[in-house]
Amino acid sequence: GVAASLVMTALGSRVTPETVYWLWGLALLFSLFRIRWMCFAYAAGALGVLQTAASVADGQALERLPDVLARIVHSLQSAHMPSVLALVAVMHLAEEALIRFHGTGLAMPIFVEGKRGKVVGGYQLQGYWPVPLLLLVPASAGALPEGGFALEWPPLFGGGVDAWAWLAFPAMIGFAEQTTAFLPKRKARRTSARLAAYGAVLLAAAAAAEYVPWLALPAACLSVLLHEGLVLWSRLEESASPPRYVHGPTGLMVLGVIPGSPAEALGITAGQTIVRVNGVRVAVKEDLHRALRQNPAYVKLELADENGEIRFMQRALYAGEHHQLGIILAPDEDVSYIVERAERPLAGYVWMKLAGLLRRLPPRAESGKAQRAGNAQGS
Protein backbone atom coordinates (compact mmCIF):
# COMPACT_ATOMS: atom_id res chain seq x y z
CA GLY A 1 0.00 0.00 0.00
CA VAL A 2 2.81 2.40 0.86
CA ALA A 3 4.70 1.69 -2.37
CA ALA A 4 1.57 2.05 -4.51
CA SER A 5 0.67 5.29 -2.72
CA LEU A 6 4.16 6.69 -3.39
CA VAL A 7 3.88 5.85 -7.09
CA MET A 8 0.46 7.47 -7.32
CA THR A 9 1.80 10.50 -5.44
CA ALA A 10 4.51 10.92 -8.06
CA LEU A 11 2.00 10.52 -10.89
CA GLY A 12 -0.75 12.65 -9.39
CA SER A 13 -4.41 11.77 -9.68
CA ARG A 14 -7.76 13.39 -10.34
CA VAL A 15 -9.79 10.66 -8.67
CA THR A 16 -12.72 12.23 -6.82
CA PRO A 17 -14.74 10.64 -4.00
CA GLU A 18 -17.59 10.14 -6.49
CA THR A 19 -15.24 8.17 -8.75
CA VAL A 20 -14.29 5.96 -5.79
CA TYR A 21 -18.00 5.26 -5.19
CA TRP A 22 -18.45 4.35 -8.85
CA LEU A 23 -15.48 1.98 -8.85
CA TRP A 24 -16.57 0.15 -5.71
CA GLY A 25 -20.23 0.10 -6.75
CA LEU A 26 -19.47 -1.38 -10.15
CA ALA A 27 -17.00 -3.88 -8.67
CA LEU A 28 -19.59 -5.11 -6.14
CA LEU A 29 -22.23 -5.30 -8.87
CA PHE A 30 -20.00 -7.43 -11.10
CA SER A 31 -19.10 -9.70 -8.16
CA LEU A 32 -22.74 -10.80 -8.07
CA PHE A 33 -22.05 -12.67 -11.32
CA ARG A 34 -18.43 -13.82 -10.91
CA ILE A 35 -16.08 -13.19 -8.03
CA ARG A 36 -13.09 -12.45 -10.28
CA TRP A 37 -15.05 -9.63 -11.93
CA MET A 38 -14.70 -7.74 -8.67
CA CYS A 39 -11.29 -6.65 -9.98
CA PHE A 40 -11.14 -2.89 -10.63
CA ALA A 41 -9.98 -3.59 -14.20
CA TYR A 42 -13.58 -4.45 -15.10
CA ALA A 43 -15.05 -1.58 -13.09
CA ALA A 44 -12.70 0.88 -14.83
CA GLY A 45 -13.72 -0.44 -18.25
CA ALA A 46 -17.41 -0.10 -17.43
CA LEU A 47 -16.84 3.38 -15.99
CA GLY A 48 -15.16 4.45 -19.24
CA VAL A 49 -18.17 3.29 -21.25
CA LEU A 50 -20.62 5.02 -18.88
CA GLN A 51 -18.61 8.24 -18.97
CA THR A 52 -18.62 8.24 -22.78
CA ALA A 53 -22.39 7.79 -22.76
CA ALA A 54 -22.84 10.54 -20.14
CA SER A 55 -20.64 12.99 -22.05
CA VAL A 56 -23.37 13.27 -24.71
CA ALA A 57 -25.49 15.29 -22.27
CA ASP A 58 -24.71 19.03 -22.37
CA GLY A 59 -25.60 21.69 -19.81
CA GLN A 60 -29.12 22.25 -21.16
CA ALA A 61 -29.84 18.52 -21.11
CA LEU A 62 -28.70 18.29 -17.49
CA GLU A 63 -31.07 21.12 -16.51
CA ARG A 64 -34.03 19.17 -17.88
CA LEU A 65 -33.13 16.05 -15.90
CA PRO A 66 -34.36 15.36 -12.34
CA ASP A 67 -31.90 16.58 -9.72
CA VAL A 68 -30.74 13.10 -8.63
CA LEU A 69 -30.24 11.91 -12.20
CA ALA A 70 -28.41 15.12 -13.10
CA ARG A 71 -25.97 14.55 -10.23
CA ILE A 72 -25.34 11.00 -11.38
CA VAL A 73 -24.62 12.13 -14.94
CA HIS A 74 -22.39 14.95 -13.70
CA SER A 75 -20.39 12.55 -11.50
CA LEU A 76 -19.80 10.35 -14.55
CA GLN A 77 -18.76 13.30 -16.68
CA SER A 78 -16.27 14.49 -14.05
CA ALA A 79 -14.53 11.09 -13.78
CA HIS A 80 -10.95 11.47 -15.00
CA MET A 81 -10.36 8.21 -16.85
CA PRO A 82 -6.56 8.53 -17.28
CA SER A 83 -6.24 8.75 -13.48
CA VAL A 84 -8.59 5.79 -12.99
CA LEU A 85 -6.67 3.65 -15.48
CA ALA A 86 -3.34 4.66 -13.93
CA LEU A 87 -4.70 3.60 -10.54
CA VAL A 88 -5.73 0.20 -11.92
CA ALA A 89 -2.31 -0.21 -13.54
CA VAL A 90 -0.43 0.61 -10.33
CA MET A 91 -2.63 -1.78 -8.33
CA HIS A 92 -1.81 -4.61 -10.75
CA LEU A 93 1.89 -3.80 -10.50
CA ALA A 94 1.53 -4.07 -6.72
CA GLU A 95 -0.29 -7.38 -7.19
CA GLU A 96 2.57 -8.57 -9.40
CA ALA A 97 5.09 -7.86 -6.63
CA LEU A 98 2.99 -9.66 -4.01
CA ILE A 99 2.60 -12.74 -6.22
CA ARG A 100 6.29 -12.78 -7.08
CA PHE A 101 7.37 -12.77 -3.42
CA HIS A 102 4.48 -14.60 -1.73
CA GLY A 103 2.69 -16.59 -4.46
CA THR A 104 4.52 -19.88 -3.85
CA GLY A 105 3.70 -19.82 -0.14
CA LEU A 106 -0.01 -19.52 -0.97
CA ALA A 107 -0.05 -22.70 -3.08
CA MET A 108 -2.27 -25.55 -1.85
CA PRO A 109 -2.18 -29.09 -3.32
CA ILE A 110 -5.49 -30.26 -4.78
CA PHE A 111 -7.01 -33.16 -6.73
CA VAL A 112 -8.89 -32.22 -9.91
CA GLU A 113 -10.44 -34.00 -12.86
CA GLY A 114 -8.15 -33.96 -15.88
CA LYS A 115 -8.99 -33.48 -19.54
CA ARG A 116 -9.74 -37.18 -20.09
CA GLY A 117 -11.69 -37.71 -16.90
CA LYS A 118 -8.70 -39.02 -14.95
CA VAL A 119 -8.01 -37.54 -11.52
CA VAL A 120 -4.71 -35.63 -11.47
CA GLY A 121 -2.86 -33.56 -8.93
CA GLY A 122 -2.50 -29.83 -9.08
CA TYR A 123 -2.12 -26.65 -7.10
CA GLN A 124 -4.48 -23.84 -6.19
CA LEU A 125 -2.66 -20.53 -5.88
CA GLN A 126 -4.87 -17.96 -4.23
CA GLY A 127 -4.27 -14.84 -2.21
CA TYR A 128 -6.08 -11.63 -1.28
CA TRP A 129 -4.59 -8.53 0.28
CA PRO A 130 -6.26 -5.36 1.57
CA VAL A 131 -4.36 -2.34 0.24
CA PRO A 132 -5.07 1.03 1.89
CA LEU A 133 -4.03 3.79 -0.50
CA LEU A 134 -3.51 7.53 -0.11
CA LEU A 135 -4.14 9.31 -3.39
CA LEU A 136 -2.98 12.79 -4.27
CA VAL A 137 -6.05 14.54 -5.70
CA PRO A 138 -7.15 18.12 -6.46
CA ALA A 139 -8.15 19.88 -3.24
CA SER A 140 -11.46 20.98 -4.75
CA ALA A 141 -12.52 17.42 -5.63
CA GLY A 142 -16.06 16.93 -4.43
CA ALA A 143 -16.30 16.39 -0.67
CA LEU A 144 -12.67 17.30 0.01
CA PRO A 145 -12.01 20.48 1.97
CA GLU A 146 -10.90 23.59 0.10
CA GLY A 147 -7.34 24.76 0.38
CA GLY A 148 -4.70 22.07 0.07
CA PHE A 149 -1.03 22.37 -0.75
CA ALA A 150 1.14 22.92 -3.79
CA LEU A 151 3.52 20.39 -5.32
CA GLU A 152 7.17 20.95 -6.10
CA TRP A 153 6.94 18.82 -9.28
CA PRO A 154 4.52 18.70 -12.22
CA PRO A 155 2.54 15.43 -11.87
CA LEU A 156 1.68 13.46 -15.00
CA PHE A 157 -2.07 13.51 -14.33
CA GLY A 158 -2.32 16.93 -12.73
CA GLY A 159 -2.11 19.53 -15.45
CA GLY A 160 -3.74 22.81 -14.43
CA VAL A 161 -4.20 21.85 -10.75
CA ASP A 162 -2.73 24.32 -8.25
CA ALA A 163 -3.80 22.86 -4.88
CA TRP A 164 -3.73 19.22 -3.79
CA ALA A 165 -5.08 17.13 -0.91
CA TRP A 166 -5.06 13.51 0.26
CA LEU A 167 -7.88 11.04 -0.39
CA ALA A 168 -8.04 7.67 1.39
CA PHE A 169 -8.87 4.87 -1.05
CA PRO A 170 -9.55 1.39 0.39
CA ALA A 171 -8.77 -1.32 -2.14
CA MET A 172 -8.49 -5.08 -2.33
CA ILE A 173 -6.19 -6.94 -4.70
CA GLY A 174 -5.85 -10.66 -5.19
CA PHE A 175 -5.42 -13.52 -7.60
CA ALA A 176 -6.53 -17.11 -8.06
CA GLU A 177 -4.86 -19.64 -10.35
CA GLN A 178 -4.99 -23.40 -10.78
CA THR A 179 -2.21 -25.42 -12.32
CA THR A 180 -1.79 -29.07 -13.13
CA ALA A 181 1.15 -28.57 -15.48
CA PHE A 182 3.67 -26.42 -13.60
CA LEU A 183 5.44 -26.23 -10.27
CA PRO A 184 3.88 -23.59 -7.97
CA LYS A 185 6.98 -21.37 -8.14
CA ARG A 186 7.03 -21.41 -11.93
CA LYS A 187 3.29 -20.73 -12.16
CA ALA A 188 3.60 -17.80 -9.76
CA ARG A 189 6.47 -16.35 -11.81
CA ARG A 190 4.52 -16.67 -15.05
CA THR A 191 1.48 -15.00 -13.52
CA SER A 192 3.48 -12.16 -12.00
CA ALA A 193 5.38 -11.51 -15.26
CA ARG A 194 2.14 -11.23 -17.22
CA LEU A 195 0.62 -8.91 -14.62
CA ALA A 196 3.72 -6.71 -14.83
CA ALA A 197 3.29 -6.47 -18.60
CA TYR A 198 -0.42 -5.73 -18.16
CA GLY A 199 0.27 -2.95 -15.67
CA ALA A 200 2.95 -1.38 -17.87
CA VAL A 201 0.76 -1.42 -21.00
CA LEU A 202 -2.25 -0.01 -19.14
CA LEU A 203 -0.13 2.73 -17.55
CA ALA A 204 1.16 3.71 -20.99
CA ALA A 205 -2.42 3.77 -22.31
CA ALA A 206 -3.47 5.99 -19.39
CA ALA A 207 -0.63 8.42 -20.14
CA ALA A 208 -1.63 8.50 -23.81
CA ALA A 209 -5.27 9.20 -22.87
CA GLU A 210 -4.11 12.14 -20.71
CA TYR A 211 -2.74 13.91 -23.78
CA VAL A 212 -5.16 12.52 -26.39
CA PRO A 213 -8.60 12.59 -24.69
CA TRP A 214 -10.40 10.47 -27.30
CA LEU A 215 -8.14 7.55 -26.35
CA ALA A 216 -9.83 7.31 -22.92
CA LEU A 217 -12.57 4.94 -24.13
CA PRO A 218 -10.24 2.60 -26.09
CA ALA A 219 -7.90 2.53 -23.08
CA ALA A 220 -10.81 1.66 -20.77
CA CYS A 221 -11.86 -1.18 -23.09
CA LEU A 222 -8.23 -2.30 -23.22
CA SER A 223 -8.30 -2.63 -19.42
CA VAL A 224 -11.00 -5.32 -19.69
CA LEU A 225 -9.85 -7.04 -22.87
CA LEU A 226 -6.24 -7.43 -21.75
CA HIS A 227 -7.35 -8.75 -18.37
CA GLU A 228 -9.62 -11.34 -19.98
CA GLY A 229 -6.77 -12.15 -22.35
CA LEU A 230 -4.52 -13.01 -19.40
CA VAL A 231 -7.17 -15.37 -18.01
CA LEU A 232 -7.65 -17.04 -21.40
CA TRP A 233 -3.88 -17.31 -21.94
CA SER A 234 -3.44 -19.12 -18.63
CA ARG A 235 -6.27 -21.56 -19.36
CA LEU A 236 -5.06 -22.35 -22.87
CA GLU A 237 -1.54 -22.87 -21.56
CA GLU A 238 -2.80 -25.33 -18.95
CA SER A 239 -5.01 -27.12 -21.48
CA ALA A 240 -2.16 -27.51 -23.98
CA SER A 241 0.32 -28.84 -21.39
CA PRO A 242 0.33 -32.44 -20.12
CA PRO A 243 -0.52 -32.94 -16.43
CA ARG A 244 2.58 -32.96 -14.30
CA TYR A 245 1.34 -34.50 -11.06
CA VAL A 246 0.58 -38.06 -12.18
CA HIS A 247 2.40 -41.29 -11.41
CA GLY A 248 4.70 -42.47 -14.19
CA PRO A 249 6.47 -45.72 -15.05
CA THR A 250 9.55 -44.78 -13.01
CA GLY A 251 7.83 -44.32 -9.64
CA LEU A 252 5.48 -42.25 -7.48
CA MET A 253 5.04 -38.53 -8.12
CA VAL A 254 5.30 -36.19 -5.12
CA LEU A 255 2.52 -33.60 -5.10
CA GLY A 256 3.58 -31.89 -1.88
CA VAL A 257 4.92 -32.32 1.63
CA ILE A 258 3.40 -31.55 5.01
CA PRO A 259 5.21 -28.72 6.84
CA GLY A 260 7.32 -29.95 9.76
CA SER A 261 7.29 -33.55 8.52
CA PRO A 262 10.25 -35.89 7.89
CA ALA A 263 9.76 -35.31 4.15
CA GLU A 264 10.36 -31.58 4.60
CA ALA A 265 13.41 -32.28 6.77
CA LEU A 266 14.81 -34.54 4.05
CA GLY A 267 14.34 -31.82 1.43
CA ILE A 268 11.70 -33.60 -0.63
CA THR A 269 9.82 -31.16 -2.87
CA ALA A 270 6.85 -31.19 -5.22
CA GLY A 271 7.55 -32.57 -8.67
CA GLN A 272 10.08 -35.17 -7.57
CA THR A 273 9.52 -38.87 -8.30
CA ILE A 274 10.09 -41.54 -5.64
CA VAL A 275 11.95 -44.37 -7.41
CA ARG A 276 13.04 -46.65 -4.54
CA VAL A 277 12.37 -46.83 -0.80
CA ASN A 278 14.76 -48.93 1.32
CA GLY A 279 16.05 -50.48 -1.90
CA VAL A 280 12.57 -51.51 -3.09
CA ARG A 281 11.22 -50.05 -6.34
CA VAL A 282 7.80 -48.44 -5.82
CA ALA A 283 5.08 -48.18 -8.46
CA VAL A 284 1.90 -47.78 -6.38
CA LYS A 285 1.09 -46.35 -2.97
CA GLU A 286 0.94 -49.81 -1.36
CA ASP A 287 4.56 -50.43 -2.43
CA LEU A 288 5.61 -47.34 -0.49
CA HIS A 289 3.83 -48.52 2.66
CA ARG A 290 5.35 -52.01 2.48
CA ALA A 291 8.85 -50.63 1.89
CA LEU A 292 8.56 -48.27 4.88
CA ARG A 293 7.41 -51.12 7.14
CA GLN A 294 10.54 -53.11 6.31
CA ASN A 295 12.62 -50.77 8.49
CA PRO A 296 10.47 -48.66 10.84
CA ALA A 297 13.53 -46.96 12.38
CA TYR A 298 15.33 -45.79 9.25
CA VAL A 299 14.52 -44.88 5.66
CA LYS A 300 16.60 -44.63 2.50
CA LEU A 301 15.08 -42.93 -0.52
CA GLU A 302 16.02 -42.69 -4.16
CA LEU A 303 14.27 -39.82 -5.96
CA ALA A 304 14.43 -38.31 -9.44
CA ASP A 305 14.06 -34.54 -9.82
CA GLU A 306 12.29 -32.78 -12.69
CA ASN A 307 15.41 -33.11 -14.85
CA GLY A 308 15.69 -36.86 -14.22
CA GLU A 309 18.74 -36.58 -11.97
CA ILE A 310 18.81 -39.15 -9.16
CA ARG A 311 19.14 -37.99 -5.55
CA PHE A 312 19.69 -40.16 -2.48
CA MET A 313 18.24 -39.28 0.93
CA GLN A 314 18.24 -41.06 4.27
CA ARG A 315 17.03 -40.34 7.77
CA ALA A 316 16.20 -41.95 11.09
CA LEU A 317 12.51 -42.32 11.90
CA TYR A 318 10.94 -41.73 15.31
CA ALA A 319 7.72 -42.75 17.00
CA GLY A 320 4.78 -40.47 16.34
CA GLU A 321 6.00 -39.22 12.96
CA HIS A 322 3.81 -39.35 9.89
CA HIS A 323 3.40 -42.91 8.59
CA GLN A 324 4.05 -41.75 5.01
CA LEU A 325 6.89 -39.37 5.96
CA GLY A 326 4.51 -36.46 5.38
CA ILE A 327 4.59 -36.97 1.61
CA ILE A 328 1.45 -36.01 -0.32
CA LEU A 329 1.38 -38.25 -3.38
CA ALA A 330 -0.28 -37.50 -6.68
CA PRO A 331 -3.74 -39.09 -6.74
CA ASP A 332 -4.60 -42.52 -8.03
CA GLU A 333 -8.07 -43.76 -8.90
CA ASP A 334 -8.92 -44.33 -5.22
CA VAL A 335 -9.73 -40.75 -4.14
CA SER A 336 -12.71 -39.66 -2.07
CA TYR A 337 -12.96 -36.07 -3.29
CA ILE A 338 -11.82 -33.68 -6.01
CA VAL A 339 -11.88 -29.91 -6.36
CA GLU A 340 -14.46 -28.76 -8.89
CA ARG A 341 -13.42 -26.05 -11.31
CA ALA A 342 -16.25 -23.52 -11.21
CA GLU A 343 -16.57 -19.74 -11.17
CA ARG A 344 -19.12 -18.62 -8.63
CA PRO A 345 -20.52 -15.21 -7.69
CA LEU A 346 -19.66 -13.59 -4.38
CA ALA A 347 -22.97 -14.72 -2.89
CA GLY A 348 -22.08 -18.32 -3.78
CA TYR A 349 -18.86 -18.16 -1.78
CA VAL A 350 -20.67 -16.59 1.19
CA TRP A 351 -23.34 -19.31 1.06
CA MET A 352 -20.69 -22.06 0.92
CA LYS A 353 -19.02 -20.66 4.05
CA LEU A 354 -22.35 -20.35 5.90
CA ALA A 355 -23.43 -23.85 4.86
CA GLY A 356 -20.15 -25.30 6.09
CA LEU A 357 -20.53 -23.48 9.41
CA LEU A 358 -24.11 -24.68 9.85
CA ARG A 359 -23.10 -28.29 9.14
CA ARG A 360 -20.56 -28.14 11.96
CA LEU A 361 -23.10 -26.83 14.48
CA PRO A 362 -25.22 -29.45 16.34
CA PRO A 363 -29.01 -29.14 15.89
CA ARG A 364 -30.64 -27.25 18.75
CA ALA A 365 -33.30 -29.84 19.40
CA GLU A 366 -30.87 -32.75 19.58
CA SER A 367 -28.37 -30.87 21.72
CA GLY A 368 -31.18 -29.87 24.08
CA LYS A 369 -32.38 -33.47 24.37
CA ALA A 370 -28.84 -34.67 25.01
CA GLN A 371 -28.40 -32.07 27.74
CA ARG A 372 -31.68 -33.03 29.44
CA ALA A 373 -30.76 -36.73 29.24
CA GLY A 374 -27.41 -36.02 30.83
CA ASN A 375 -29.06 -34.08 33.65
CA ALA A 376 -31.49 -36.94 34.22
CA GLN A 377 -28.71 -39.51 34.43
CA GLY A 378 -26.75 -37.32 36.81
CA SER A 379 -29.73 -37.08 39.16
Regions found by a protein language model. Give the residues of each.
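Hydrophobic core segments of alpha-helical transmembrane domains in multi-pass membrane proteins
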Residues: 19-27, 44, 84-91, 166-170, ...
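Membrane-helix interface "capping/anchor" motifs
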Residues: 30-43, 178-190
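Generic multipass alpha-helical transmembrane bundles of integral membrane proteins
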Residues: 53-184
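Interdomain regulatory linker/hinge segments that flank or connect interaction modules
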Residues: 151-157, 174-237
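PDZ/PDZ-like groove recognition
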Residues: 232-265
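PDZ-domain C-terminal substructure recognizer with occasional recognition of PDZ-binding tails
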Residues: 238, 287-333
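Conserved PDZ fold ligand-binding element
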Residues: 263-285
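Long, low-complexity intrinsically disordered regions
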Residues: 325-379
